Amino acid sequence: HIWNEAAAAVTYEIYASQYAALGKKQEAGAFKRAAHLALRSIGRWIREDGSGFIVKNRFPIEVMHGYESYSAQSQYNLLACWLMCVAYLYADNSIKESPSPSDIGGYVLVMKDVFHKVFANSGGNYVEYELSGDPRYNATGLIRIHLKNSNPQLGPSDGIPHKWDNKKKQDLGGELYAVGPEWHDAAGGVYRLAEYTNILFPDTSYFSAYKGSKLPEIDVRNVRQSVDGVAFEVVYTGRFDGVTQISQRVYIDHTGITVRDILKGNVKKVRACYPMLIDDGMEETKIDFQDGKVILQSRDGQICFQAISPPNATIQRKRKRIPYRNGYADIAYFESDKNVIQYKITTEF
């Protein structure tokens, strides 16, 4: 919902003013910059009548696409407006902007125990990794990629969760997808890391594809943090339908996001899956398949999903139309008969 950015703007303006009062100009400027970035994000979601798209898609209000049961055009516009007014009241426009952490990056923030997330940023290129998805809201794996100077919704900006009826508290099923591995076994079974939700703090009332008698181990390793680039590796060890270990190595620098997936086990082939926004409710994404890559273009940005290993891989699409918060998605993929697969998401192509 767009009120999240409005709430962030309030927090950042308060901190900017407090740091300025302490004479800490650089910190104050960083929070001022962050407040402006939050408000700029809201500016992407203004309707022709001046109200906001409360969820980040452009479907008509009456469709309620991507809404929660408690979402409504009225109260969430009012909440966002009220929060922006509060931000205005706290704002000190004598504070000059300085770079914020989201501009510079150089960090990997591991929040395993409570939020089961990893956040990482290098030079404004950013990812969110969901270590153990709640299937009502998130798949497991790499669910969000935002690249500097691109359309954030193309990232993708969200994974694909199950459809959930909040009023009846009922899981309506569906397909779970994130950026990451899918594997096929000799018997024809198809499995994805994204499906192994609800595995860190399991709740038996929620879906998980994991059937092992012992919970898997989830480790975040090989964290690297520098101004030039950041990296981390997520390793799952357990019983994943023929696979005993899944590793995703994520490297971020100014050129984009590079991912290497390694599976240990008896698999017939491995695919790298990439959820593509194909329709935001008002505009369909332009999709261009070229040798070893697919280029997406929508509104003010482009992004490229590119196969690195195996070389000469062909990128295909599943030709699905899966509803999720940002609109409808299809899945781009390429495959390998090896247990290692590598790819890149970039704006440089």
Give, region by region, the residue ranges found by the protein language model.
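Generic recognition of long tandem-repeat/solenoid scaffolds
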Residues: 118-122, 230-236, 287, 293-298, ...
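A short beta-strand/turn structural motif
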Residues: 270-292
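Extracellular polysaccharide-recognition and catalytic grooves
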Residues: 1-115
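Intrinsic-disorder/low-complexity loop/linker signature
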Residues: 93, 169, 175, 188, ...
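Beta-strand-rich recognition/accessory modules
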Residues: 275-277, 290, 299-300, 306-349
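Catalytic and substrate-binding regions of extracellular carbohydrate-active enzymes
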Residues: 72-75, 85-272
